[in-house]
Amino acid sequence: MRPSGREADQLRPLKITRNFTKHAEGSVLIECGDTKVICTATVVSGVPRFLKGKGQGWITAEYGMLPRSTHSRMDREAARGKQGGRTVEIQRLIGRSLRAAVDLKKLGENTITIDCDVIQADGGTRTASITGGFVALADAMRVLVENKKVKENPIVSQIAAISVGVYKGVPVLDLDYPEDSNAETDMNVIMNDKGGFIEIQGTAEGEAFSDEHMMGMLAVARKGIAEIMEAQRAALFDK
């Protein structure tokens, strides 16, 4: 039995609220159970130096957690004077994942920054950031099209992400913090709407996982991501 009482392949309640803030070209509050993340998409003209003159755009991401998003207060990274390794790893993952959704040539020489701010953490913050970040990105692309900054929408794939793991010997979907902190294996899976894998990050905690467990985790991930993509589409078509 999972601590939450959910079935092995059951997602936490998922809610995606668009237009959560008024200034950004795209903004979303994503709630995955008790994990809550604000994702905003900001469009600026121009690209990083390494892309100048190449006729393509860029998508990057930043990630952070509010000091009391967790059980005990943590210092802001700005107060420490540098980002931690975990933060850098997560924002690179978000950026890579969302670039896989876009034809960067069609974006032109524009840069979109996805800011992911965790206001409450209960497991799965990086996957929630990717899922919510995609919706914010899609809204930003609509703004570019409406303002005739691009000729056509550069999005070519829908992207979503989920955490899976092995908990008490069973592959389970969408780990919350009590499960994540006690899982034998935890894995993050990012997929597109064509059934392709963008990235898989998996780690065994103390004991190696088997082929059977691997296939079980991927099976529940596929099911969960299909449901998440339905929620993304429902949010995007809700005017």
Curated annotation (Swiss-Prot):
* EC number(s) given by UniProt: 2.7.7.56
GO MF assignments: 3'-5'-RNA exonuclease activity; tRNA binding; tRNA nucleotidyltransferase activity
Q: Which domain of life is it from?
A: Bacteria
> Pfam families, per this entry?
RNase_PH, RNase_PH_C
Give the residue spans that cross the bilayer: none
Q: Which reaction does it catalyse?
A: tRNA(n+1) + phosphate = tRNA(n) + a ribonucleoside 5'-diphosphate
* Entry annotated with the keyword rRNA processing: yes
Q: Does the keyword rRNA processing apply?
A: yes
Write the record's keywords in alphabetical order, separated by commas. Nucleotidyltransferase, RNA-binding, rRNA processing, Transferase, tRNA processing, tRNA-binding
Record's PROSITE patterns?
RIBONUCLEASE_PH
Which top EC class is given? transferase
Which Gene Ontology BP annotations are present?
rRNA catabolic process; rRNA processing; tRNA processing
UniProt xrefs under InterPro entries: ExoRNase_PH_dom1, ExoRNase_PH_dom2, ExoRNase_PH_dom2_sf, PNPase/RNase_PH_dom_sf, Ribosomal_Su5_D2-typ_SF, RNase_PH, RNase_PH_bac-type, RNase_PH_CS
**Which annotated residues bind phosphate?**
R86, G124, T125, R126
Biological role stated in the UniProt entry: Phosphorolytic 3'-5' exoribonuclease that plays an important role in tRNA 3'-end maturation. Removes nucleotide residues following the 3'-CCA terminus of tRNAs; can also add nucleotides to the ends of RNA molecules by using nucleoside diphosphates as substrates, but this may not be physiologically important. Probably plays a role in initiation of 16S rRNA degradation (leading to ribosome degradation) during starvation.
The Swiss-Prot or TrEMBL record describes its family as follows: Belongs to the RNase PH family.
Q: Which NCBIfam families match?
A: RNasePH
Listed under subunit, the entry gives:
Homohexameric ring arranged as a trimer of dimers.
The protein here is known as Ribonuclease PH
Naturally occurring in which organism (per UniProt): Marinomonas sp. (strain MWYL1)
